[in-house]
Amino acid sequence: MKMSIVIILLLFTCLIATNGASGTKCSGSPECVKFCRTKGCRNGKCMNRSCKCYLCS
């Protein structure tokens, strides 16, 4: 019983972490550059229809 609660909590934590890590939806990298610069990052790329920001301070 305790093990199943631990597994459920672990899955719930993973779902929250992946949801917070995802960027905005995109169709091309130029959209992400503007979005990432507003967040304080130097560059951004569109990967799997989601913005990924790089070189953040």
From Swiss-Prot:
Example of a GO cellular component annotation carried by this entry: extracellular region
Methyltransferase as UniProt keyword: no
Disulfide-bond pairs as recorded: 26-46, 32-51, 36-53, 41-56
Signal peptide positions (record): 1-23
GO molecular function: ion channel inhibitor activity; potassium channel regulator activity; toxin activity
Site (Aromatic residue of the functional dyad): 54
Keywords: Disulfide bond, Ion channel impairing toxin, Neurotoxin, Potassium channel impairing toxin, Secreted, Signal, Toxin
Site annotation Basic residue of the functional dyad: residues: 45
Subcellular location: Secreted
Pfam families: Toxin_2
Listed InterPro entries: Scorpion_toxin-like_sf, Scorpion_toxinS_K_inh
Reported tissue expression: Expressed by the venom gland.
Domain of life of the organism encoding this protein: Eukaryota
Record Gene3D superfamilies: Knottin, scorpion toxin-like
Family of the protein in this entry: Belongs to the short scorpion toxin superfamily. Potassium channel inhibitor family. Alpha-KTx 23 subfamily.
Anything else known: Negative results: recombinant toxin does not cause hemolysis in human erythrocytes.
Task performed by this protein: This toxin shows both immunosuppressive and anti-inflammatory activities. It has the potential to inhibit human T cell activation, since it reduces IL-2 secretion and the expression of T cell activation marker CD69 and acts as an anti-inflammatory agent, since it provokes the reduction of secretion of both IFN-gamma and TNF-alpha. In vivo, the delayed-type hypersensitivity response in rat autoimmune disease model is ameliorated in the presence of this toxin. Acts by blocking Kv1.3/KCNA3 potassium channels of T-lymphocytes.
Domain notes: Has the structural arrangement of an alpha-helix connected to antiparallel beta-sheets by disulfide bonds (CS-alpha/beta).
Protein name as annotated: Potassium channel toxin alpha-KTx 23.3
Lineage summary: Eukaryota, Metazoa, Ecdysozoa, Arthropoda, Chelicerata
